[in-house]
Amino acid sequence: MNRREFTRLTSLAALILPRQKDWGLITDVNQLHPNAVKKQCIAAFKRFEQVWNFNDFWKRGNTFDACLVFADALHKKWPADKDVIAVLKSIDSMLEENYRYFKSFDAGKMWADDFGWWGLMAINARKHLLRSGNEVLADKYTKLSIELCWQQEKEHAYDFSDTAKPVPHGCRNGDADGQDKGVKNTVTNVLFFLLSCRIYRLLSTEKQTGNEQYLEMAYHQWLWFDSWFKLTGYGYLQQLGNDAVLVMERPTAFFDGSDYKNTTHPTWEKGWLWTGDQGMLMAALTELLNIKNDIAAWIMRNHADTGFNSAVFENSINHYIKSLAKGVNLGLIGNTDNIIREAPFKANFGPEFGNDYLAGRGILMRYMGQLGNKAGGVNFKKCITATAAAIWHTQDVVTNQFSPEFTSNESDELYAQQYRKLTGLGDPAMKWQIQAMNEQQKFGVCQSIGLDAFGALINQL
């Protein structure tokens, strides 16, 4: 650690830890000072209140999901705290405005994955609104999640044909009007996978009927991913060694007749992967484990899969979760500072879609926090703590605005070298090329990354 980094980290110690502690020596998250963390969380939210109301459909859904998951963690940790209660009340009115925003759009003009982000957010909105006693708006968000978001993906993105090679079905990230068919990338498919699981669990918990179609689609999405993962020759799962893997941005197969040759929308780069996909896939697989018995019973009732074996099914899910967790730990966390990073690919950072992929680190931490202290058998406490610390220390001290960059140039290059040595792929270290990004969108997304990090941190206290 160089002098600059040491100064940065020890300065942060005075903010987030008891004054006598040295951040650079902290290995146990229990040494964090909860009241200091709570104050930082409140400050982070107050800034989010100022920047969240921007105009961008998918980013709006994702950033508010970050806010809701963060607020849920706050509530669980400090349910009676007056400042936390004030945060929850503010979110009530923000959800009213967000619902009006969603309804103002023509659904036919939106991309398929946009509805996945909003569908997941709507389920968390329902939970929040029921807790605050607003059943009317909670039911509107349930309808939004199921009848608008899930149905849109099913009708306009899912490939019902059996002809796609080498793997049939899956979802295309096209627009609902069909002007652009899009590509069957990971984010579109994992969003539909996770959303199907969560809608099924929601309806089952509330004893509602007519929920088998969500169970069926969750299983079909599992088959799509599992089929690809078994085709090891195509490298959809990046093998990092020691049973550690990361999932690529999209599955590709370059042969005559393949339906997976698309290298545009956005421009593909060999080995390219995104942090957000890793967190969502671990979450979807974990949700699948929670409904494994229901799936087995549904298959038996409907004779849906003659080769189904419940033990093999469960073991496969657990294997993928553990392998992905190991992959994140090995490939997406800097060895020198324990900070969670985006994989070093121009496709992530570049001007074409850097403003979209910017949010990935937060999305990964969001699901890390929800999955618990040892997701997939890996303890992520240290990296969540270090990342939240770095985000806090690099904020604007006047506005409490978080930055897209919260690591040093030197440590970024060390990480890029670490990644290339591990995989043989990737580019030199680079900064986020988001100069053309609307400023308020940038502020909102960056603040949501911080909320994701602090939400995960709260769950470690």
Regions found by a protein language model. Give the residues of each.
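CBM-like carbohydrate-recognition segments
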Residues: W23-D113, W117, L137, E155-P168, ...
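Mobile, glycine-rich extracellular loop/lid and propeptide segments
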Residues: K109-A122, T142, L148
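Inter-helical turn/loop segments and adjacent helix faces that build the functional surface
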Residues: S132-G133, I199-E212, L288-I299
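Active-site cradle of extracellular carbohydrate-active enzymes
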Residues: S196, N211-L288, A325
